[in-house]
Curated annotation (Swiss-Prot):
S-adenosyl-L-methionine binds at Y39, G64, C65, S66, D89, N90, D117, I118, N132, R199. The gene is cmoA. This is Carboxy-S-adenosyl-L-methionine synthase. Mechanistic analyses show the involvement of a unique ylide intermediate as the carboxyl acceptor in the conversion of SAM to Cx-SAM. It catalyses: prephenate + S-adenosyl-L-methionine = carboxy-S-adenosyl-L-methionine + 3-phenylpyruvate + H2O. Homodimer. GO terms for cellular component: cytosol. The keyword Signal does not apply. Catalyzes the conversion of S-adenosyl-L-methionine (SAM) to carboxy-S-adenosyl-L-methionine (Cx-SAM). One of its GO terms (molecular function) is carboxyl- or carbamoyltransferase activity.
Length: 247
């Protein structure tokens, strides 16, 4: 059962940096629905993309799986034999709950839920990889190497789904979408104090990129095609495709 997010409703003397700890994991479903515009649509559409791209006898990776929402969406839409989903997160609290969520929904496709660092996981025989609001928490200097590894581990014709919060090269547009996002959170019941305190904790650990920067990295990794398929305010998702005739 999900609890309502009230983590920042009272003043916190020393905020520190954001961590995905037990307190966050407990309220995460409510938090992300009220904080990330379009999140439910992205999760649903990841399942539709899985139906199109997952191939028999291959693996799907959910890198930074949190509580397993994307993993479950993928699994509901796999209709092939001998597939496996590998879900990884470095937060013990998230992984504990993820295992419970996965076990609560029975399906033929097995899921390996792993507590670990996505930078250390080998990507092999993959028809689809999901990075759902995960890359933004890596150091910018480490992002290209992860995308390179994903490209190498994808089979020809495979897909990467990359969802992120974006920054914008046009400052005026960035300001507008930033303010619209805050309006969204206010409309979902967050107070000015809650919005401010959460932003202060996130600003040193969640470093956003522009869509142009993401596309450049994907191109450098080897992806022949990439495009933004969903956006709501300053949140969105790209799909990157490995050519069917890639070596």
């Amino acid at each position: 059962m999900s609890h309502r997010d009230t983590l920042f409703s009272a003043p916190i003397a020393r905020l520190g940096d954001w961590t995905f700890d037990e307190r966050v994991a407990e309220v995460f479903p409510d938090m992300i629905q009220r904080s990330v515009p379009g999140y439910s649509n992205i999760i649903s559409m990841i399942g539709m993309l899985a139906e199109r791209f997952v191939q028999p006898g291959t693996q799907v990776y959910d890198l930074g799986c949190s509580l397993g929402a994307a993993t479950l969406s993928v699994r509901r839409n796999i209709h092939h034999d001998n597939c496996k989903i590998i879900a990884i997160d470095n937060s013990p609290a998230m992984i504990e709950r993820c295992r419970r969520h996965i076990d609560a929904y029975k399906a033929p496709t097995p899921v390996d839920v792993i507590e670990g660092d996505i930078r250390d996981i080998a990507i092999e025989n993959a028809s689809m990889v999901v990075l759902n609001f995960t890359l933004q928490f890596l150091e910018p200097s480490e992002r290209q190497a992860l995308l390179d590894k994903i490209y190498q581990g994808l089979n020809p014709g495979g897909a990467l789904v990359l969802s992120e919060k974006f920054s914008f090269e046009d400052a005026k547009v960035g300001e507008l979408l930033f303010n619209m996002h805050h309006d969204f959170k206010r409309a979902n019941g967050y107070s000015e104090l809650e919005i401010s305190q959460k932003r202060s904790m996130l600003e040193n650990v969640m470093l956003t990129d522009s869509v142009e920067t993401h596309k450049a990295r994907l191109h450098n990794a080897g992806f022949e095609h990439s495009e933004l398929w969903f956006q709501c305010f300053n949140f969105g998702s790209l799909v990157a495709l490995k050519a069917e005739d890639a070596a």
